[in-house]
UniProtKB/Swiss-Prot annotation:
Region (Disordered): 1-23
Membrane topology (UniProt): Lipid-anchor
UniProt disease link: Tenorio syndrome: A disease characterized by overgrowth, macrocephaly, and intellectual disability. Some patients may have mild hydrocephaly, hypoglycemia, and inflammatory diseases resembling Sjogren syndrome.
Protein's name according to its UniProt entry: E3 ubiquitin-protein ligase RNF125
Binding of Zn(2+) 3, residues: 100, 103, 115, 119
Species of provenance: Homo sapiens (Human)
Length: 232
């Protein structure tokens, strides 16, 4: 997949990742497997696949998207969300084995992160493994009760619940202080596009935006009329 460090935000990768990146660049023949994350340069942990097809650690891509204005840290393609779990990769990792680069112990790839956290040779060389901070808030899909990152909810609903018509409460409204989630009971996808969208240009129907604006203008006019009537 390549080893690409994200520096647009001015925030550096963990020290251990930086050290390994410099070492790999000095040795161009060192192979980088498809199980390496291009952000932290370690074996994948909870792999997710982005819309552009690249696979990263879940916490790495979530943090990278927040810091780099929603672009893929590998190919710079626009991404509306962190992607979906790469279950095929996770399954393969459970049956693949690799020698630890530092102590040469044969380790299952799905357990490699746990191994290097305690590998003394790794710690002596790079310091303790540092995971990128995971800052995205989490919510629960009201249709299937799956726990998601808030930025993945729209993608998830479009993919799995496009035909749903039953009224539900918006889980993102519950995350906003002083917001009343009981005030919403319409199409969740439309509501997310209109009320909770910052970078979902590919999914936006501008007719929906126009409807929402007209509705807001009418609501404001009605409120002004009621207030005026009460004062006269």
């Amino acid at each position: 997949m390549g080893s690409v460090l994200s520096t647009d935000s001015g925030k550096s990768a963990p020290a251990s990742a930086t050290a390994r990146a410099l070492e790999r660049r000095r040795d161009p023949e060192l192979p980088v497997t498809s199980f390496d994350c291009a952000v932290c340069l370690e074996v994948l942990h909870q792999p997710v696949r982005t819309r552009c097809g690249h696979v990263f650690c879940r916490s790495c891509i979530a943090t990278s998207l927040k810091n780099n204005k929603w672009t893929c840290p590998y190919c710079r393609a626009y991404l509306p969300s962190e992607g979906v779990p790469a279950t095929d990769v996770a399954k393969r990792m459970k049956s693949e084995y690799k020698n630890c680069a530092e102590c040469d112990t044969l380790v299952c790839l799905s357990e490699m992160r746990a191994h290097i956290r305690t590998c003394q040779k790794y710690i002596d060389k790079y310091g303790p493994l540092q995971e990128l901070e995971e800052t995205a808030a989490r919510c629960v899909c009201p249709f299937c009760q799956r726990e998601l990152y808030e930025d993945s909810l729209l993608d998830h609903c479009i993919t799995h619940h496009r035909s749903e018509r039953r009224p539900v409460f918006c889980p993102l409204c519950r995350l906003i202080p002083d917001e009343n989630p009981s005030s919403f009971s319409g199409s969740l996808i439309r509501h997310l596009q209109v009320s909770h969208t910052l970078f979902y240009d590919d999914f936006i129907d501008f007719n929906i935006i126009e409807e929402a604006l007209i509705r807001r203008v009418l609501d404001r006019s009605l409120l002004e009329y009621v207030n005026h009537s009460n004062t006269t």
